[in-house]
């Protein structure tokens, strides 16, 4: 048996009457890795998380968790013991407004059975880790949503668990707070924690996950490293920004760029498109994903006088393409001009502020 496995789902299924919220999921999470659990709203992510937390019981299948060095099947008899090795943030945290973060952390440390004589020292460690010293003794009612989310994550790890489970930890947060939460998650990985993170934000997952599990309509449709998933995504999107281009000439500029890059994209003309995102001033080119084609496109744009100040293929863009292909019931995407506006709407919905 693999001693590195910390959580394992075996044929995990949850059925509500005739509806399968989760269907026959098999998944292993290894020690010290971040696994991103990705899917659109209603895909089955939260249901899976709640089964892991024993808030819902599986209709079929098993959950195995490592406790005291052994992988053990989760049941009503051992749930308190096994789940004590996991820190959960399943839903947006809600705290009494008139208490302080210090009191909240003391409460959760006691609730989780952390040694009484070590609680104060543990709280000081958490304060330093989350940079909470300026507001640890202030009343929570004055806090932003991002600050409350930090307290929620801090409460989840106050008892120093080996495994941390976070359900949509960045939902509803502003960009600054999302970056802070991302950095805290990476710090937790650095000190050896195993993290299972659900999200519908592709950009969030692509930045931090070692492996990505993609779920749709209750079915696990992919589980692999980001690099391997990207290799399977045959198409990619180049993002680039130009220096000082006139806004009024965008339409003619897009047409000209498309004529320049069409022979170099590695895909047929009817699939070619070039896009411009006005809010972020970012141009997009759809191509086959090969490094050589990417270089040829870059050189051709420079040769034709385009002054490029940024040029990249964001990981989130690659993951987005694969995700869209997998959840599309037809098994393919139409990237022709007739469907271009539809693609942009999906793009904006799935990757919020990717290029901010």
Predicted regions located by residue number:
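ABC transporter nucleotide-binding domains
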Residues: 5-7, 14-197, 202-216, 222
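Short alpha-helical
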Residues: 77, 96, 203, 221, ...
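C-terminal coupling/interaction segments
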Residues: 289-356
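Short regulatory "switch" loops immediately downstream of catalytic or recognition motifs
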Residues: 62-72, 256-264, 329-330
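A short linear hydrophobic-aromatic micro-motif
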Residues: 131, 270-274, 307-312
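ABC transporter nucleotide-binding domain
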Residues: 182-284, 288
């Amino acid at each position: 048996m693999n001693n590195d496995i910390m959580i394992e789902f075996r044929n995990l299924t949850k059925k509500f009457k005739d509806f399968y919220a989760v269907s026959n999921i098999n998944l292993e999470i290894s020690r010290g890795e971040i696994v991103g659990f990705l899917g659109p709203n209603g895909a089955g992510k939260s249901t899976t998380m709640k089964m892991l937390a024993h808030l819902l019981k599986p209709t079929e299948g098993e959950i195995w968790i490592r406790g005291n060095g052994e992988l053990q099947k989760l049941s009503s008899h051992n749930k308190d013991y096994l789940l004590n090795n996991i820190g959960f943030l399943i839903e947006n945290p809600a705290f009494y407004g008139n208490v302080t973060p210090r009191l909240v952390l003391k409460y959760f440390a006691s609730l989780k059975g952390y040694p009484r004589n070590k609680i104060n020292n543990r709280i000081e460690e958490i304060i330093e880790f989350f940079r909470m010293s300026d507001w640890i003794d202030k009343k929570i009612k004055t806090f932003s949503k991002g600050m409350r989310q930090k307290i929620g994550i801090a409460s989840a790890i106050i008892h120093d668990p080996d495994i941390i489970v976070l359900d949509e930890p960045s939902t509803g947060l502003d960009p600054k707070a999302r970056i802070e939460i991302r950095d805290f998650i990476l710090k937790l990985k650095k000190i050896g924690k195993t993290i299972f993170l659900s999200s519908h934000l592709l950009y969030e997952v692509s930045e931090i996950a070692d492996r990505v599990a993609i779920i749709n309509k209750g079915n696990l449709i992919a589980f692999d490293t980001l690099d391997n998933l990207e290799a399977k995504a045959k198409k990619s999107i180049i993002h680039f920004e130009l220096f000082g281009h006139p806004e009024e000439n965008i339409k003619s500029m897009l047409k000209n760029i498309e004529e320049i890059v069409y022979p170099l994209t590695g895909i047929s003309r009817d699939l070619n498109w070039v896009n411009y995102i006005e809010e972020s001033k970012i141009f997009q080119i759809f191509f086959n994903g090969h490094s050589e084609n990417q270089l040829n496109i870059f050189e051709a744009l420079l040769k034709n006088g385009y002054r490029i100040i940024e040029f990249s293929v964001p990981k989130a863009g690659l993951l987005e393409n694969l995700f869209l292909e997998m959840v599309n019931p037809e098994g393919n995407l139409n990237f022709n001009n007739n469907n271009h506006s539809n693609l942009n709407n999906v793009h904006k919905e799935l990757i919020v502020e990717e290029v901010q």
